[in-house]
């Protein structure tokens, strides 16, 4: 009898909340968009391996924006640069909150910048900014970190060239490079490029990304049936890897002689007034956040950039010529503007293969209005609290209305007086990644060294596939190429 009553109550809740709610809040039901099924929403219309391409299909059909349900979540997808600016930048206070899935929240535990509330995010970001503004490292020390870790990478690639008849698969080496850079930045400790700790950290970052993708993230009704033991387990595993280094710095910390990013974060904790908003318990999460976010985004950009340069010898040669013409063997960050072609090429790779083709969604925390001049039908819409806002960077990046010959790799679109359509590297608005400038600087130094030292050629002159797949981020099929060491004389 009791079981029957429970089933009836759950059924009523299910029908009320999930089957009858198909975008009926405020103006959402008026917004055009695909048909949404109960529970699934429009997930049926998406290709799992080419998720970003499915957005292109709706872009062509609905233009500026449309309503869609991802599982049980109401979403407005913004397609036009004008509309993205209007909502995400001009009304940023109303869409400040991130959408955090139950999996991300479980990983974050209230102490990670990747999965915290707006108030917590402001607190954590302010802490990071203050830590690094006090940081005496500056550009010169970052230059040293990037160059030192790159040199280990270069020597490793030379060994692979000799042992594999010049055939190298670069993706795993780029990942090791980013891990070694982040580790050195955090702890001021050098690891050998083949140190098992690098691979262990890499495995953990990939496990965390993979484990934070569960059915309950899109369909909360299944959350009570979901286990998060895998997330808890890999977080403990990764913490165990960094714990010895963290404990060492906590014991040996010299307040007057900070040597690395961790030292400066410890100083910042000590400088806080009571009660302390940030404690030592936050430190492991800051360290893990940087490994997880930095490795996937930066290494993936390195992989795509080198792949496209391998297919474009003329462009590869142009970049090397620019590097040689400036005449600086070891480029430094202060000289970055002397390399317009390289900088523009990095922007162009982010346009063609954005790591996050669909920019991280925001949650409407105050009702927002989509002004009628951006509406295809000349209307205005009030978007209610709780709706997800999804900026669709990928589709307008390939729209000839905004980019001439959008399928062509053409860095000239970002050089000189050419107008720049809204360019989104990893994100946009006030909730951008606090380490974004670190990643851009890292890419500049690595590429400035890489294309002076090596030439990349397709194997047997067969162009490498540039087809993109969505697996956590946009990535190519695994590829290899011929790597030829250049003569610096």
UniProtKB/Swiss-Prot annotation:
GO terms in the biological process aspect are:
organic acid metabolic process; xenobiotic metabolic process
User: Molecular function terms in GO for this entry?
Assistant: heme binding; iron ion binding; oxidoreductase activity, acting on paired donors, with incorporation or reduction of molecular oxygen, reduced flavin or flavoprotein as one donor, and incorporation of one atom of oxygen
**What's a Pfam family this protein contains?**
p450
Entry membrane topology: Single-pass membrane protein
Q: GO CC terms for this protein?
A: cytoplasm; intracellular membrane-bounded organelle; membrane
Provide the E.C. number(s) assigned to this enzyme: 1.14.-.-
**Cofactors (names):** heme
The domain of life is Eukaryota
Name the residues that bind heme. 433
Regions crossing the membrane: 1-21
Task: Kindly state which keywords UniProt assigns to this record, in alphabetical order.
Answer: Heme, Iron, Membrane, Metal-binding, Monooxygenase, Oxidoreductase, Transmembrane, Transmembrane helix
- Gene3D superfamilies referenced in this protein's UniProt entry, alphabetically: Cytochrome P450
Kindly give the PANTHER family that the UniProt entry links to this protein: CYTOCHROME P450 508A4-RELATED, CYTOCHROME P450 FAMILY
Protein's name according to its UniProt entry: Probable cytochrome P450 522A1
UniProt lists the gene as: cyp522A1
């Amino acid at each position: 009898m009791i079981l029957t009553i429970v089933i009836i109550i759950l059924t009523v809740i299910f029908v009320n909340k999930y089957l009858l709610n198909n975008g009926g809040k405020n103006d959402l039901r008026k917004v055009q968009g695909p048909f949404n099924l109960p529970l699934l929403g429009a997930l049926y219309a998406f290709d799992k391996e080419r998720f970003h391409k499915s957005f292109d299909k709706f872009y062509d059909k609905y233009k500026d924006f449309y309503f869609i349900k991802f599982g049980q979540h109401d979403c407005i997808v913004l397609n036009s640069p004008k509309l993205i600016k209007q909502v995400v930048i001009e009304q940023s206070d109303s869409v400040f909150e991130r959408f955090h899935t139950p999996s991300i929240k479980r990983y974050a535990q209230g102490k990670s910048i990747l999965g915290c509330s707006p108030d917590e995010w402001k607190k954590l970001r302010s802490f990071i900014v203050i830590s690094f503004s006090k940081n005496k490292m500056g550009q010169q020390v970052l230059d040293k970190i990037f160059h030192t870790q790159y040199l280990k990478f270069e020597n490793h690639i030379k060994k692979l060239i000799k042992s594999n008849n010049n055939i190298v698969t670069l993706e795993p080496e780029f990942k090791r490079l980013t891990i070694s850079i982040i580790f050195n930045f955090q702890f001021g400790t050098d690891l050998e490029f083949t140190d098992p700790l690098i691979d262990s950290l890499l495995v953990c970052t990939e496990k965390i990304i993979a484990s934070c993708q569960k059915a309950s993230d899109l369909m909360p009704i299944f959350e009570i049936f979901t286990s998060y033991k895998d997330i808890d387990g890999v977080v403990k595993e990764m913490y165990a890897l960094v714990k010895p280094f963290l404990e060492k710095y906590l014991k040996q910390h010299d307040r007057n002689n900070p040597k690395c990013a961790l030292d400066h974060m410890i100083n910042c904790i000590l400088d806080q007034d009571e009660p302390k908003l940030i404690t030592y318990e936050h430190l492991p999460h800051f360290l893990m956040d940087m490994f997880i976010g930095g490795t996937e985004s930066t290494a993936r950009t390195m992989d795509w950039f080198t792949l496209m340069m391998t297919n474009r010898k003329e462009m590869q040669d142009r970049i090397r010529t620019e590097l040689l013409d400036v005449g600086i063997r070891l480029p430094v960050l202060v000289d970055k503007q002397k390399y317009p072609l390289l900088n523009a090429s990095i922007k162009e790779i982010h346009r063609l293969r954005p790591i996050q083709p669909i920019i991280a969604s925001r949650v409407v925390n105050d009702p927002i209005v989509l002004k009628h001049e951006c509406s295809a039908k000349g209307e205005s819409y009030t978007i209610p609290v709780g709706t997800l806002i999804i900026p669709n960077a990928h589709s307008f990046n390939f729209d000839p209305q905004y980019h001439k010959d959008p399928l062509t790799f053409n860095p000239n679109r970002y050089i000189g007086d050419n107008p720049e359509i809204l360019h989104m590297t990893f994100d946009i608005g006030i909730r951008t990644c606090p380490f974004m400038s670190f990643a851009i600087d890292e890419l500049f130094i690595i590429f400035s060294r890489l294309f002076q030292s090596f030439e990349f050629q397709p194997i047997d002159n067969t162009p490498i596939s540039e087809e993109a797949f969505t697996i956590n981020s946009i990535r190519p099929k695994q590829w290899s190429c011929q790597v030829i060491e250049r003569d610096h004389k």
